[in-house]
C-alpha cells in the first residue's frame, strides 16, 4: 500500500493446539482500529457465483442484502474469469469482518483514492507501518501486528502464546471504477520477535 492506495486485509491467526500441523483449530482475528465501531460488520457473509462463461463478471450476494459483481477487466488479466479455479462448486461463501469502504473518486481527475485505516490491517497505509517501505509505490511497505490483539469471536482477548498459521481476507466489499474491486495483496510474513 501507499498513500491513497490501501486495500485493507483482515488478519487471522491460529495456534496448532492439537499439534497435527494442520490449520484445523480455532481462528482468531487480530483486531484493528475499526473493531467495535458501528459501521464495522462482524460475521459478514458474501456468496460468489461461478460465471456461466469465460471473460464474464463474478456475481455476488452479501448477508446485508446487497448484490453486485466483480468486474472482469480484460485489460489487466488474461485468466478466463476471477472465480477461484480450485473451487469445484458453483458458489462459495466467505464469512468475516467487513470494514466501511473508504474509496472515493476525484471528480476533477477521475483518479480513485482508497484511504487508509489507522492500524491493524495488511496492505494498509496506516500508522502501524514498519520503517523501510516506499511511500510512492508501496514496494517494501510492511505493517506490524501484535499477537496481543488476537480476539475471540465475541471480542474478548484470546491470549495466544504464538501463531502457527495466518489467514488474510479482504476487509472491504467495494469497487473503484476502472481500477476494479478493492482487494488485498500480501507478499510475505515475518516473525519480528526473533
Residue ranges of predicted features:
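Ser/Thr/Pro-rich, low-complexity mucin-like regions
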Residues: 137-194
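Low-complexity, serine/threonine/proline-enriched polar segments
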Residues: 33-136
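Eukaryotic short linear interaction motifs
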Residues: 19-21, 37-39, 174-176
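Acidic, glycine-anchored loop motifs typical of Ca2+
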Residues: 17-26, 128
Amino acid at each position: 500500500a501507499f498513500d491513497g492506495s490501501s486495500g485493507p486485509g483482515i488478519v487471522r491467526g491460529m495456534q496448532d493446539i492439537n499439534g497435527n500441523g494442520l490449520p484445523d483449530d480455532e481462528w482468531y482475528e487480530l483486531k484493528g482500529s475499526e473493531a467495535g465501531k458501528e459501521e464495522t460488520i462482524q460475521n459478514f457473509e458474501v456468496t460468489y457465483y461461478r460465471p456461466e462463461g469465460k471473460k464474464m463478471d463474478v456475481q455476488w450476494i452479501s448477508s446485508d442484502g446487497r448484490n453486485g459483481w466483480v468486474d472482469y477487466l480484460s485489460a489487466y488479466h488474461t485468466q478466463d474469469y476471477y472465480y477461484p479455479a480450485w473451487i469445484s462448486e458453483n458458489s462459495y461463501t466467505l464469512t468475516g469482518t467487513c470494514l466501511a469502504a473508504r474509496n472515493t473518486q476525484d471528480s476533477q481527475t477521475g483518479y480513485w483514492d482508497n484511504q487508509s485505516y489507522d492500524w491493524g490491517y495488511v496492505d494498509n497505509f496506516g500508522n502501524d507501518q514498519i520503517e523501510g517501505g516506499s511511500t510512492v509505490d508501496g514496494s517494501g511497505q510492511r505493517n506490524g501486528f501484535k499477537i496481543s490483539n488476537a480476539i475471540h469471536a465475541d471480542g474478548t482477548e484470546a491470549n495466544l502464546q504464538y501463531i502457527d498459521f495466518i489467514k488474510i481476507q479482504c476487509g472491504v466489499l467495494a469497487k473503484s471504477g476502472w481500477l476494479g474491486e478493492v482487494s488485498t495483496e500480501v507478499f510475505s510474513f515475518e516473525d519480528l520477535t526473533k
